[in-house]
Amino acid sequence: MAFEELLEDPVIQKYLHELVGPKGMPVAAAPPDGEVTDEELAEELGLELNDVRRALFILYENDLATYRRLRDEDSGWLTYLWTFQYEKIPEQLQEEMHRLLDGLEERREYERENEFYLCEHCGIRFEFGEAMEFGFECPECGNQVETMENTRLVTAMENRLEELRDELNADVDVEA
């Protein structure tokens, strides 16, 4: 997929936004062809140099940008020339979705395996053991805690897991 096509994809735009934040998004959304300095980017985009550097470093940490250093022979100053490498984004998104799938499966099991109690007044949720420790009273307000039904939450998680598996074409057995 070409740079332009990648950057038009709303999922990829959101991914980049999550990485670099709103101040770094102009840097991530307009990668120049070839090498560019952070100063050139800041001037071209009308951004603070620190915001550009922060975005570039985040992109670098996520293998979406590389740099090479040049030392000015007269002044000894280093110049960093940055290159964007967005070819890895689809693979990284897939890895992120697998992490999400794993985390959601763990959370679903936690929700299934535990009994919960809720203080209607404070909105605090307790596991059975915690509720029992407190004598089934909320430690914040003293009200009685009530059994909390989480079937809808588990069902919503199962639906989301199914959607993720479909998107990933994962061959994972759905537990009943």
Swiss-Prot record:
InterPro entries: TF_E_archaea, TFE, TFIIE/TFIIEa_HTH, TFIIE_asu, TFIIEa/SarR/Rpc3_HTH_dom, WH-like_DNA-bd_sf, WH_DNA-bd_sf. Keywords: DNA-binding, Transcription, Transcription regulation. Gene3D superfamilies: RNA polymerase ii, chain L, Winged helix-like DNA-binding domain superfamily/Winged helix DNA-binding domain. Transmembrane segments: none annotated. One of its GO terms (molecular function) is DNA binding. GO terms for biological process: regulation of DNA-templated transcription; transcription initiation at RNA polymerase II promoter. It comes from the Archaea. Residues 8-90 form the HTH TFE/IIEalpha-type domain. Monomer. Interaction with RNA polymerase subunits RpoF and RpoE is necessary for Tfe stimulatory transcription activity. Able to interact with Tbp and RNA polymerase in the absence of DNA promoter. Interacts both with the preinitiation and elongation complexes. Belongs to the TFE family. The winged helix domain is involved in binding to DNA in the preinitiation complex. Transcription factor that plays a role in the activation of archaeal genes transcribed by RNA polymerase. Facilitates transcription initiation by enhancing TATA-box recognition by TATA-box-binding protein (Tbp), and transcription factor B (Tfb) and RNA polymerase recruitment. Not absolutely required for transcription in vitro, but particularly important in cases where Tbp or Tfb function is not optimal. It dynamically alters the nucleic acid-binding properties of RNA polymerases by stabilizing the initiation complex and destabilizing elongation complexes. This is Transcription factor E. It comes from Haloarcula marismortui (strain ATCC 43049 / DSM 3752 / JCM 8966 / VKM B-1809). The gene is tfe.
